[in-house]
């Protein structure tokens, strides 16, 4: 996720930020038996799909898998700047 954001926006992230994100992905993997690469791919695909309909702030995006008893929930916090005009009221 950080690699994608860095490539798109050209922002540098500190080593601490990168290490923190990697640790978070490892912890999610341990709790849900989902690989960090799977979660990263999921985030990238969510960005791709949601960006068709809305302008979002990728750097503020947070996608996690949370476990409670025997269930896993996908929790996404995605800051939306605005809806794209072509998507408003369009039907597929």
From Swiss-Prot:
It comes from Symbiobacterium thermophilum (strain DSM 24528 / JCM 14929 / IAM 14863 / T). HAMAP family: MinE. InterPro entries: MinE, MinE_sf. Belongs to the MinE family. This is Cell division topological specificity factor. Keywords: Cell cycle, Cell division. Prevents the cell division inhibition by proteins MinC and MinD at internal division sites while permitting inhibition at polar sites. This ensures cell division at the proper site by restricting the formation of a division septum at the midpoint of the long axis of the cell. Coiled coil: none annotated. One of its GO terms (biological process) is regulation of division septum assembly.
């Amino acid at each position: 996720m950080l690699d994608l954001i860095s490539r798109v926006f050209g922002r540098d992230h500190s080593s601490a930020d990168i290490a923190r994100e990697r640790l978070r992905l490892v912890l999610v993997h341990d709790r849900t038996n989902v690989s960090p690469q799977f979660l990263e791919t999921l985030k990238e695909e969510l960005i791709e799909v949601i960006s068709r309909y809305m302008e979002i702030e990728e750097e503020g995006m947070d996608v996690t898998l949370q476990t409670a008893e025997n269930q896993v929930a996908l929790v996404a916090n995605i800051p939306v700047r605005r809806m794209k005009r072509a998507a408003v009221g369009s039907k597929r």
